[in-house]
Amino acid sequence: KDELYEVDFLRHLYKKVAQSNVLIVNHAFLAQESLRKQPLLPESPWLIIDEAHHLPDIASRMASERVNSVILKKQVTHFIEKEQLFVALQQIFQQFSEEQRFVKIYQQGLLDFVDEWQDFLFELHRLFSKTQKRIDHQELLLTKERIDYLSAAGEKHSQTLQLLLQELLTIQSKLQQTIMSQLETFSLADRIVFVRLFQFFDEIERIHHCFTIYLDDWRPRWVKEYLPQNEDHGLIEIHDLEASLLPETKWYPRYERIIYTSGTLKFGNNKKYLPQRLGLTEVTFKTLPTPYNYAENARVYVPEEAVAIQNASSYEMGQYISDTIEKLMAQEERSMLVLFTSHELLSTVYHQVQPRLLEKGQEVLAQGISGSREKILKRFSNGKPNVLLGADSFWEGVDLPGTALQLLIVTRLPFENPKRPLVQAKYAYLEAEGIQPFAQEAVPKAALRLRQALGRLIRSEEDRGALLILDRRLVTAKYGKRLIKVFPKGLSVKEAPMPEILEELKEFLNK
């Protein structure tokens, strides 16, 4: 036993876990229980899942797998050339002639696999190029109908890849058996090499799992994407549309009672949306009254001048958003969070508004441009009036109470992009299940995200803030009324000209 065994940090952690009455983990750690060979979390009478509205998307994200040809080639090259892993294994197995032979075969198999992989991607690239002019750096959906037109060469490469993977897995199993059965005879240095080797073995198993599903499993639950970088490099990716169905996970039966908590568990009076996404049929729902007086402390406006989203170009939309930001900052001189659904539009607005506000001594911070999320939030909350342009994670998890944030702009209703192949595939899957994609998935999901955006403003009973939604579909579209229902009772949405909104804001925010 190693002299540091008793103070090993991982053993210390597991010991603390075994002694604890309460364990706190994030959603991703919980979702990964279904992917682990052995569970890391103990069985328990109780499981409490806070911010449970995140669970479906996180479970789906954790179940997604990808193989990147560039990263794969770098990994293999790194192990063979830089780390000299297989040279070290040959030395370790000096007394094991059979294992030395396996190591040589395994190393050559890896090199052959990388070459075949590039050849397969070349044929996959040709397959998509037949029907689409521009495919590099695009998200492309691989369907059964399309793969049936794969060339004979592509079919041969795919079969060779599967054979090579099977050979690699067989050798991995034999080497693991030898190592584990003779573990006490190997030195500490040898065991460190084995740790790196086993980590790589796990990666090959993952690639095998991903590739097998990508080519052979055509159940509706699986969505396959091809993301080419050039002719012989790219990514393949699989997504499991049923990953969020909790009764099918490995961890769900290990808990007797599960409590799901969140400020956005329901959509208006609809309490079925989240349970349906999680595959739950029998749930007891309890709604607690909010401690916040939204009618008194919050306002929601839709400017009458807002441009028609459907007809506006990205430049026109960017110009309108920039003008709105400038007008608000000229009057209020308060920090403002502006939320986007498109990084392209965010960048357009940044480059339009940043020079204008900089002349007035006001800083504009933008996600993906001004540094890391943590760095941006730190600069944003420094007490000086500035503007933060954000997307994705900035819609939630931003905690800026009091006067740190009193103005929030939503540039566009937060619907998923229906042109994305993954979204199209998900909607087709839901339709096949008898679910109306727009009414029963897109609208509720957008509504809950809108509610989360409002939650950035009111973080305590003393907070005051105003939300401007620059998308007139909220008040003109038929589904707008359904979206509005997600806001707390007593909080109405007012449509008014921008000068009137500015006048009301002056009085409201300076109370």
Identify the meaning behind each predicted range:
Residues 1-511:
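ASCE RecA-like P-loop NTPase motor cores
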